[in-house]
Amino acid sequence: MNPLLSFKDVSKGFEDVQILNEINIDIEPSYFYTLLGPSGCGKTTILKLIAGFEYPDSGDIIYKDKPIGKMPPNKRKVNTVFQDYALFPHLNVFDNIAYGLKLKKLSKSEIKRKVTEALQLVKLSGYEHRQIQGMSGGQKQRVAIARAIVNEPEILLLDESLSALDLKLRTEMQYLLRELQSRLGITFIFVTHDQEEALALSDYIFVMKDGKIQQFGTPIDIYDEPVNRFVADFIGESNIVHGTMVEDFVVNIYGQNFDCVDMGIKENKKVEVVIRPEDISLVSQNDGLFKAKVDSMLFRGVHYEICCKDRKGYEWVIQSTKKANVGSEVGLYFEPEAIHIMVPGETEEEFDKRIESYEDYHHA
């Protein structure tokens, strides 16, 4: 089956600044996708190109096997929820949601039915006659989403839609968005710079930097198997250290050999090693793979964040449910599966091949 939407070598610049560089992506129907990256990486530009608010300088955008790169926005089965909601302040909730339906000249009874259903979906039943000015940020966000889904788009675009909400409201909206996407079966494309939000919401994530896709995959794939230092550092907390590949399943870190689960890398190849803080355990000095001294400890609510320095002066961050005494000597332990090897300069295609060969080896 062909993708619902594809970018084919799409580039876009503004004046002398290149924003997107030969972007290639495929969007399948009925999934929740997230474009994740820092400010200025090009993620919102991709959203604007999908919506038709901008046109590509080169390459093309294919929707259901037809090029739409130059198609005007009103001809696309796409709706957008903006960061600032873009609601009409002089219209009440009902009229805001009904606006697009009235333009389509639907009957009053059909409009009322659709608006009522949309309000039920976003859990705002009974709010039809409320004025926009008197609503909270979370309520305005729900109205904006209802206005988008009432038009039954095939793709719903969400541009940093939760960033203005406080933590509790943002969490509630995350649950609502996932519930809506599952129930309606609409393809969602969500833009955010918030890594936790992307991991929680998405079926698939595009990680972006400097106008290029760094990695594409499921949240678990990207978290567990980052393709490069940027992805590893951007997605969650990481201990990233230099190492040398001794042979398949053995890596040398700072002069000490460790068992790992990576293979297919040349012997003596310089690599970068990622170990997540939650994968490191504090143990007795005798039980540790190496020894370290506790430098500091912060309470983060669900865990303690403990910073240690090993005897060679390298720092390690550990997330533990157990306290540690600052200044104490401890052992650090992690399983071979906790070690992830990254090869500097390796492309995503090369990385994927290496991971596949490792999986084939273990299934043989």
UniProtKB/Swiss-Prot annotation:
<dbReference type="InterPro" id="IPR013611">
    <property type="entry name" value="Transp-assoc_OB_typ2"/>
</dbReference>
<dbReference type="InterPro" id="IPR003439">
    <property type="entry name" value="ABC_transporter-like_ATP-bd"/>
</dbReference>
<keyword id="KW-0472">Membrane</keyword>
<dbReference type="InterPro" id="IPR008995">
    <property type="entry name" value="Mo/tungstate-bd_C_term_dom"/>
</dbReference>
<keyword id="KW-1278">Translocase</keyword>
<dbReference type="GO" id="GO:0016887">
    <property type="term" value="F:ATP hydrolysis activity"/>
</dbReference>
<dbReference type="InterPro" id="IPR012340">
    <property type="entry name" value="NA-bd_OB-fold"/>
</dbReference>
<dbReference type="InterPro" id="IPR050093">
    <property type="entry name" value="ABC_SmlMolc_Importer"/>
</dbReference>
<comment type="subunit">
    <text>The complex is composed of two ATP-binding proteins (PotA), two transmembrane proteins (PotB and PotC) and a solute-binding protein (PotD).</text>
</comment>
<dbReference type="InterPro" id="IPR005893">
    <property type="entry name" value="PotA-like"/>
</dbReference>
<keyword id="KW-1003">Cell membrane</keyword>
<dbReference type="Pfam" id="PF00005">
    <property type="entry name" value="ABC_tran"/>
</dbReference>
<protein>
    <recommendedName>
        <fullName>Spermidine/putrescine import ATP-binding protein PotA</fullName>
        <ecNumber>7.6.2.11</ecNumber>
    </recommendedName>
</protein>
<dbReference type="InterPro" id="IPR027417">
    <property type="entry name" value="P-loop_NTPase"/>
</dbReference>
<dbReference type="Pfam" id="PF08402">
    <property type="entry name" value="TOBE_2"/>
</dbReference>
<feature type="domain" description="ABC transporter">
    <location>
        <begin position="5"/>
        <end position="235"/>
    </location>
</feature>
<dbReference type="GO" id="GO:0005524">
    <property type="term" value="F:ATP binding"/>
</dbReference>
<dbReference type="InterPro" id="IPR017879">
    <property type="entry name" value="PotA_ATP-bd"/>
</dbReference>
<dbReference type="InterPro" id="IPR003593">
    <property type="entry name" value="AAA+_ATPase"/>
</dbReference>
<dbReference type="InterPro" id="IPR017871">
    <property type="entry name" value="ABC_transporter-like_CS"/>
</dbReference>
<dbReference type="GO" id="GO:0043190">
    <property type="term" value="C:ATP-binding cassette (ABC) transporter complex"/>
</dbReference>
<comment type="function">
    <text>Part of the ABC transporter complex PotABCD involved in spermidine/putrescine import. Responsible for energy coupling to the transport system.</text>
</comment>
<dbReference type="GO" id="GO:0015594">
    <property type="term" value="F:ABC-type putrescine transporter activity"/>
</dbReference>
<feature type="binding site">
    <location>
        <begin position="37"/>
        <end position="44"/>
    </location>
    <ligand>
        <name>ATP</name>
    </ligand>
</feature>
<comment type="similarity">
    <text>Belongs to the ABC transporter superfamily. Spermidine/putrescine importer (TC 3.A.1.11.1) family.</text>
</comment>
<keyword id="KW-0813">Transport</keyword>
<keyword id="KW-0067">ATP-binding</keyword>
<keyword id="KW-0547">Nucleotide-binding</keyword>
